[in-house]
Each structure stands twice: as C-alpha cells, then as structure tokens.
C-alpha cells in the first residue's frame, strides 16, 4: 500500500514539473496590436480583352487582402474582392477600357492604408464578323424628323430600321402615321425597312386579338397589305404587357404570320421581353416562349433595357450583369445568328413627382444645368447623378452613354450574336455611334 502511495506521489510531482516547464519555456501567444502595413509592389500581368491578374508582396501580420477598382479615373473605387492570397485575377472586364486598382491588407485589428494606385487599359475587342445594326425609328407627328435625321446621318452604319408605326386593336385593325420619308430614304440607300406593329402595351387588346383565330387572321391580312402598299421589306412585332396565359396564342399568331409572309419574301421579326430563365407564369415575360418563337422569326430582339423603369425604384437602365445573364439564357434556346441585343439611348430622371425620360444629350445638359457631377457605377457599368431642383426636390438620374454601351457591344462580340437594336434613333449622340463603329469595325 505504501508502495502505491509513493508511486502516486511521484507521478503527481512529475506532472506538476512538466506542466510548469511547458509554461515557462512555451512561446508566448503574440497578440496583434496594430493593422498591417500597406501592400507593396502592386503590378499586373496577363492583361487581355476582358481580364487581368494583379500581384503584390505579402504583408507580415495580414490575414487577407481587399482589392478595389475604379473606372475610368482614379476615384469612386468599389471593393471587388476580399481574398487570402497576394494575387487576384479580375475577369469580365470591358475591352479597350481604362481601370484603376489598389489593394489593402487587413487583420483582426484593422485595415492598412492603400497600396500604390495603378492603372491599365484592357486590349481592344473588334468584331471579326459583321454585326448588324437595327434602329427603331419613330414618327410621332407630321414634321417629326428626329429619327429621319439620325438615319440620314448614320446611313453607312445602319442596316435596318423598324418604324414604330402601327397599333392594332383587339380585332386586328391597324392604324398609324406612316413615315414615308424614312421608308423611301432607307429603301433607296440599302437599309432594310420593317413595319413595327404594337398592341400599345395593352394586355386586354392582345388577349382578345390573340385568343381568336379570326382576329389573328385579320391582323395578318392587314399587315401584309400595309407592307406591300408602303414598300416595307418585312414586319417587327412588338407585343408587350401580355398575360402569361396567352403564351400559346402568341406562338400561334407568330406561326401563322410567318407561314403567310415568309413564302412571299417578307422578313418576320419580333421584340421579346428580356428574361434570365423561362418561367411560363411570370407576369411580364411568361408569354414569350423563346425557343418556339425563334422558329417563326428571322430575328429576335431582346429588350434588354428598362431593368429599372418609370414608376419603379431608381437604378441602371441595363446593368451589365443582367444583360449578360439574359444573353446567356437566350442562347440556350435561340440561334445566335437570329439574336439582336436591345440597347438604350436614353436616361430616366426619378423624383417624387414621377419619372421623366431624356435623350443622351439632354441628360448631359440636365446635369450641367444643375451643376451635378456625373458618377460611374462600376457594378452595373452605368453612369448616374443626383441633383435637387429649384423646389428642393431630390432627383436621381441613370442613363446610358457611349461608355456603358461599350460593355454591351463587348458582349455582342464575345457571344458572337447577330448585332444590336437601338431604342431609339434620334436619342443617341455622336459618341454613341463612335462606339458602335469602333467595336463593330464599321
């Protein structure tokens, strides 16, 4: 018994000794007392049309790094990545575009100052195949020359026009002011002419029209007569605000229209609501069966604009990520050679008094008149500004311009779709056309 007590005492003393020894000789836990130093030697490699790789020296005591980007100037930076390594590959950039970057290191205590700021310009993307340019043309009143002047000025760059001419009623009767000058000039200068037919955004008109075969046939006969009489080369169907349950009837109408017009040598095209997936019961886009409609159309125009719209919350007209997602989905069901990307040439001014639309030039004038600074949102790749009017009412303005258009044209080239459709001719400015000519090598 005494033996076991002595053994137990020995083991206890030994354990205390070992624990004390480890405590005495163990390296103390270093507690961070300050944020890390700023990263150094920020450089870039592998620059291409739409990507670049950033590298910098590792920072002692840093847990990770935060990467910031701005375009086109050294201001208004956005955090684009939080990473653990000292290298970052930035993808989905626009070609031929200037970007600025800096990096910060961070740990549990805080964040470092900025690294040096660097800038670079991505490689230029030029289409290797001819891209088609369609322009929607309007003629709102006698003497309205806005679209005509744009057609005449940019004839060498425009391949097609779709004149916003006809509105149908519930029974297939069409009416509208025919832009004879636009049609005559375009036909004389090798620009294809299409007669646009709309339902005036009225789902009830479309419901009565599409759900009745007699009404559909009346409309088809009236369209055929109108394009023959006025010298059009085809038609563009722009039915919007449709009820999702009229999906099969819209498809039936396009099938009947195509089988009537196409054998006679007329083009059949249509504009469809933008969507990122097919949801047949979606309120705004459910009526459009992309896959089947493509069978009965020579061209499909994706209306990739009004992502934020009058009456809604302020925001980008067409953010680049949304536009790209729409294209990606469309390409799963529509042949790329039939696909046109809708591009906007306008802006919206939101306030508590409602929303107003402006041309690109008018938007710049609006900013100048109120001394507003135009800013750039690097997430949506869109310009915007805010101001207060004489009554003290706050306004938020988002618009499209040549710079934001560049990003869309890069997508057209990257995904090799057929081209673009501009809403609308007369709202754009010279820089807008310069972007088109440069990106499409026109």
Name each model-derived stretch:
Residues 28-61, 95, 108-127:
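Pro/Thr/Ser/Gly-rich low-complexity, intrinsically disordered linker/stalk tracts
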Residues 171-173, 244-370:
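Substrate-binding surface in catalytic domains of secreted glycosidases
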Residues 66-95, 108-118:
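Recognizes extended acidic, P/S/T-rich segments that occur
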Residues 125-222:
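Glycan-recognition patch characteristic of GH18 chitinases/ENGases
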Residues 3-27:
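Sec-dependent N-terminal signal peptides of Gram-positive bacterial secreted proteins and lipoproteins
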Residues 161, 237, 300, 341, ...:
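Conserved, mostly hydrophobic/aromatic
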Residues 338, 343-411, 437-442:
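Glycan-binding loop/region signatures in secreted carbohydrate-active enzymes
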